[in-house]
Amino acid sequence: MSGEAPRVAVDPFACPMMTMQRKPEVHDAFREAGPVVEVNAPAGGPAWFITDDALSRYVLADPRLVKDPDLAPAAWRGVVDGLDIPVPELRPFTLIAVDGEAHRRLHRIHAPAFNPRRLAERTDRIAAIAGRLLTELADASGRSGEPAELIGGFAYHFPLLVICELLGVPVTVPMAREAVSVLKALASAAQSGGGDGTDPAGGVPDTSALESLLLEAVHSARRNDTPTMTRVLYEHTQAEFGSVSDNQLVYMITGIIFAGHERTGSFLGFLLAEVLAGRLAADADEDAVSRFVEEAVRYHPPVPYTLWRFAATEVTIGGVRLPPGAPVLVDIEGTNTDGRHHDAPHAFHPDRPSWRRLTFGDGPHYCIGEQLAQLESRTMIGVLRSRFPEARLAVPYDELRWCRNGAQTARLTELPVWLR
């Protein structure tokens, strides 16, 4: 027998400023209400949240709940992030917005590029990128007498430069400092079928320089057998589809770059804060560092909720009937801090025995970049500890502030640090 979900009055999409030791009360309110709760969506109409760990994993594997943006409410078009529909040429190559066999096909293409052994072989290059960025910040801090700011100066630039290095996209450090807005403009243009990447009236940044570098990486992958990620993608896309255009390859690697730096950058900011607050023992070995990273993954998910899913047909989830097209989110942060699965769930304890978390998702859309994010995290910690053993926060830990940017990103506002 099915019924209606309880309605919760709290706003899960609000973006209050919070301290590092405070988690939004919305998650507790959700759990108290039930495993499926109904809320008012910011763009209008109802939406449903899944708050229970086991039910969340069931939902993330349920083929009736899909990521097809065509099923989103019409009023959400142009209002809700991530629901733009790519032009027909590019749509089959959208890993995060296709399901079933189409998704399995794309996963087969992407998985070899993210092979853990292949990634581990690039550890030295990843460490070199981290070391160069941190050294530049330390030198600038020494000249100015002001602390280095690691959110704007490192947390996002580091994973951006790493993923570009792996893809064979020759992005320089100065370009990385402007690349976030450029990448957003590129993604928007690709999904709308827009023109040359510029919009003088709207102030959209010129994307031509970065687009040229992406094309350069694609052309190089076609000509050379150097095993960059782009080359691996090219080979496996050819095998799956028979052919692939330059535009399609550029679209795929643009998606990888954007996903590979934005959320990783958000997480690295939180991870750095925990390390620099002295929570990682000075003599921590590799296993202890790995446990520390895993606890940070649980405690500081860079996204509070999953991407939107929509009911392809009428479904009953947790005893609640959802109509066709029903928008559904899984409460990642809430399940990660559920006392039924974790002792002292709102405390940061690197030695806790259970690493159960939903930060990287579950089911077919489990994050393919998890191994890279973990490698970047461990490598960054190693470089920081070896080159700047006396690095510390420039402000008390309790004064750090973080906020959400809508439903899909949580990030520190700034992270001032003395690099010594």
Curated annotation (Swiss-Prot):
Q: What does this protein do?
A: Involved in the biosynthesis of the anthracyclines carminomycin, daunorubicin (daunomycin) and doxorubicin (adriamycin) which are aromatic polyketide antibiotics that exhibit high cytotoxicity and are widely applied in the chemotherapy of a variety of cancers.
In its UniProt entry, what is this protein called? Cytochrome P-450 monooxygenase DoxA
Quaternary state and partners of this protein? Monomer.
| PROSITE patterns, per the entry | CYTOCHROME_P450 (PS00086)
Of which family is this protein a member? Belongs to the cytochrome P450 family.
| Organism, scientific name | Streptomyces peucetius subsp. caesius
Q: Which reaction does it catalyse?
A: 13-deoxydaunorubicin + NADPH + O2 + H(+) = 13-dihydrodaunorubicin + NADP(+) + H2O; 13-dihydrodaunorubicin + NADPH + O2 + H(+) = daunorubicin + NADP(+) + 2 H2O; 13-deoxycarminomycin + NADPH + O2 + H(+) = 13-dihydrocarminomycin + NADP(+) + H2O; 13-dihydrocarminomycin + NADPH + O2 + H(+) = carminomycin + NADP(+) + 2 H2O
Q: Which Gene3D superfamilies match?
A: Cytochrome P450
Q: GO molecular function, one example?
A: oxidoreductase activity, acting on paired donors, with incorporation or reduction of molecular oxygen, NAD(P)H as one donor, and incorporation of one atom of oxygen
Compartments where located: Cytoplasm
Q: What else is known?
A: S.peucetius subsp. caesius ATCC 27952, a mutant strain derived from S.peucetius ATCC 29050, is the only organism reported to produce doxorubicin in vivo.
- Cofactor(s) recorded in Swiss-Prot or TrEMBL: heme
**Which enzyme class?**
oxidoreductase
The record's InterPro entries line, in alphabetical order, gives: Cyt_P450, Cyt_P450_B, Cyt_P450_CS, Cyt_P450_sf
